[in-house]
Structures are given as structure tokens and as C-alpha cells.
Amino acid sequence: MQKLINSVQNYAWGSKTALTELYGIANPQQQPMAELWMGAHPKSSSRITTANGETVSLRDAIEKNKTAMLGEAVANRFGELPFLFKVLCAAQPLSIQVHPNKRNSEIGFAKENAAGIPMDAAERNYKDPNHKPELVFALTPFLAMNAFREFSDIVSLLQPVAGAHSAIAHFLQVPNAERLSQLFASLLNMQGEEKSRALAVLKAALNSQQGEPWQTIRVISEYYPDDSGLFSPLLLNVVKLNPGEAMFLFAETPHAYLQGVALEVMANSDNVLRAGLTPKYIDIPELVANVKFEPKPAGELLTAPVKSGAELDFPIPVDDFAFSLHDLALQETSIGQHSAAILFCVEGEAVLRKDEQRLVLKPGESAFIGADESPVNASGTGRLARVYNKL
């Protein structure tokens, strides 16, 4: 088991203070520190220190010894560490995104390769043939949007802005999935005078409407005053996660992170179709083809964890990763899995022991446990988060 040396991604939407306040990570240049990455992603792999004191990339170390480090089932199925674990610190809204399902990712990736679209081209949608399921676990109060509201809810919220666009009136007449799809595309397609008029109607409604989701629209409009994505809180569930609550983000479901600090776990993929709140390229036909226009009640969005002793397991409907929390005590408990694991100290102090080796993790620190090192004993105070595979 090795302590991970992790990198910070300095995206513009990141908080300049959260990682310092929570975990003491220095920020002398006062840059936005958006994400702390833990894993073996080719873009920015964590590093480990070998027995002879050399620092190497975790990705390279796994590549040399896949079966021992990943476990046979994961090595055969995925051929690499199949997840990326992050601390995400949003000071301002991220773009609304949709992740294609596995089959569409494979088809889209092959199609764009055949068309010769460069990987770094603005119009490139598919960077790899994988899907991108995600779990987000709140460390602070965390504001997000996820999945379409129930149609009756959308109807009542759209009434004050019915005059903003003909597609809104069209949906209000017959609120069904087909017309929601047309409305979604129409709002994203708005240009020039049509867009200015629609946003003026929305902003006028803000003066008379109180509470949610109008307050969320006000927050977003500070950063994206001229973006048609400002209509999205009327269509999507606005979710406020309390610390300790989590939700899973399914493929083909629009979602956005708006504000707060969370742990995020995802499959190793960069496939993103944008759907607003962004200056970047939006491929509207491809987006609409990859969205399920079906309602999901807000009450069904939270993941219900299963408690077993000191472990809290968050059920995940895919094999790419599993996520659990462990309450630590002075008495050692065994933590084991048939795969690699990344253990992250959420709070307190964790002591990990394997035979004669002992590793201490302070808040914000993490360790990599190879499959061949499982199980390890854990003790201390506070909580550990564990990401692994149940294969």
C-alpha cells in the first residue's frame, strides 16, 4: 500500500479556498483549485513512491503488474484501473452535461475516428468508447441539477414564461416526452433576437417569482447572463445535497454541478455532450439523440446507503466502481476487496496496517491498495471513503 501523490486541476470554475480550508492544500498562486484527482487517468495520473524511493506514475506501475494490482477479474474486464476518484470544488456552475450510454459511446467514437475528427477538435464529442457513470457525495452543502422534473411540475413552472418561446406554449398544450424533446432543442437553438426576447421574458419573471428554482436561475445568471441554459432549472430537478448525501448520475440524463464541495467517482471516460451553461461547442442533434426525455421524481434521486457495522455502502448500478464509507475506531477493522482500492481520509486520522507496514492518512490524503495487498487493517478516528470494484 502506498500513499498517493495527487494532482490538482485548475479549471476556471474551481474554488480558490475550499481545498485549503478542508485539507490544508496550499494555494500560493491563488488559482482556482477545481478538482483533486486520485487514480491512473492518462491525462493526470496519481504518483506513488516505490520501495527504493523512486516516484513513478500509478498508471505505469499498474501497467507493469496488472493482475496483482487490479485483481484478475478487473484486469480481464477493463485492463486498467476503471475509475477516477475526485474531490470536486465548484465555486460557480459547471456546464449542463449528458453522458452517452456505453453502446452509443462505442458507435460515436468509431464514427468520429472514421471521419478523421482530431481528438482535440472543438467539435469532437467522443474521446473514448466508454460510458461515464458518476456518483457524487456531498462534503459541504452541494447544489446541483439532475434529471427532468415530473411533467406536471414543468408545466406549472413554465406558466410564468409561456410567452418566451413558441416551443414552451407547444409543450404546455400537450406535455409529453416528444414535445419536451422539441422544447429542449428549441431553447438550445435560439439565436439573436429570438434568444434575447426569450431571456428578457425569463428575467422579467424572476422579478415576481420567489423560492426555487427561481433562486437557482438568479445564481446561474450571475455567471451566464446570456445563456439559454438559464431555462434549465425549470425543466430539471434542482437538488440540494446535505453533507453525507449522495446521488448517482445515469447515462442519457442531463445534470450540472452548481456549487459546493463533493467527492465524485466516475468511470474512466471523457465523453461529454454539453447542454448549456458553456461557451463551448454544443452538438444539438447528437445531444438530443442521447437524452432520455423521461421524468424522474426528485425524491428518487438520492442513493440510499446500506449500513453494515461501521461500513456504509452506496449501491452503484454499474461494475466500473463501488463506493463505501468507513467509520474508524481505535480497534482495528479489516477492509478488503478482490480489486484495487483507493482509500481517502475524509476527516480525522486513519491508520492503515498491512503486516509490518503502517501508513497514516490525514484529511485529504489517500492511499492505493493493490488487490494482492488486500485486506488491510484500519483504525483511528473519523471516516475513510473507499473506491474499489465488486467484481
Curated annotation (Swiss-Prot):
Its cofactor is Zn(2+). Its main location: cytoplasm. Binds 1 zinc ion per subunit. Pfam families: MPI_cupin_dom, PMI_typeI_cat, PMI_typeI_hel. One of its GO terms (molecular function) is mannose-6-phosphate isomerase activity. GO terms for biological process: carbohydrate metabolic process; GDP-mannose biosynthetic process. It catalyses: D-mannose 6-phosphate = D-fructose 6-phosphate. It is an enzyme of class 5 (isomerase). Its EC number is 5.3.1.8. The active site is at R274. It comes from the Bacteria. Zn(2+) binds at Q97, H99, E134, H255. The keyword Zinc applies. The keyword Cytoplasm applies. It is found in: Cytoplasm. Keywords: Cytoplasm, Isomerase, Metal-binding, Zinc. One of its GO terms (cellular component) is cytosol. Involved in the conversion of glucose to GDP-L-fucose, which can be converted to L-fucose, a capsular polysaccharide. PANTHER family: MANNOSE-6-PHOSPHATE ISOMERASE. Belongs to the mannose-6-phosphate isomerase type 1 family. This is Mannose-6-phosphate isomerase. The gene is manA.
